[in-house]
Amino acid sequence: MPTPNPAAMDFLLSRRSRPAKTLKAPGPDKAALMPLLTAAARTPDHGKLEPWRFIVLRDAAMRRLADAVADCGTRLGKSDEDIAKARDAWERSPLCVAVVEVQKDSPKIPALEQTYSAGAVCLALLNAALASGWGANWLSGWASHDRGFVEGALGLASHEKIAGFIHIGTEGATPPERPRPDLDQIVSWVSE
């Protein structure tokens, strides 16, 4: 028989991302962040390739990225509203962890599985932050797919991609619950 962990299950059944616009200082310091990164790095990783890495962004780096995302938006012809929304996430949030997908050459592990592992790291980091009492949100957005932004503002190599930006801070306001998937519409049972 399995040994249940009711507290963990209760957390997973009630977890809720916090909108980045509601996050405020303080964010976790290095001592508080390291266990969250450790938890995230325990993600499923077929072949133990570690096809991801972390960039911790805070303080002046957040303000620099707010300016960089605005410049990127202007270059891409984004609307003033889109630019303001993207900039706002970087200006308000006290800390962000960029999860970077770093594909590794492997004759056994397909690239897609490495992408899934990087996504799993994002979710694990998000859940670790929420379980530790922080407000957190997993964002990406148009700038995360722009090579000029990710290479120029974040220093990514040409073979690296952003899997997600995990913004972490103190929760400013509890968001209302949102509708959840109807399991009757998405679950198939096969017994033969």
Regions found by a protein language model. Name each.
Residues 1-92:
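N-terminal amphipathic, basic helical "cap/leader" segment at the start of enzyme domains
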Residues 40, 97, 103-150:
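Small-aliphatic-rich amphipathic alpha-helix that forms the alpha element of a beta-alpha
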Residues 60-64, 70-71, 103-105, 148, ...:
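Short, charged/polar surface micro-motifs in flexible loops or helix N-caps
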Residues 92-98:
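A structural motif
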Residues 149-162:
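Short, electropositive alpha-helical surface patch
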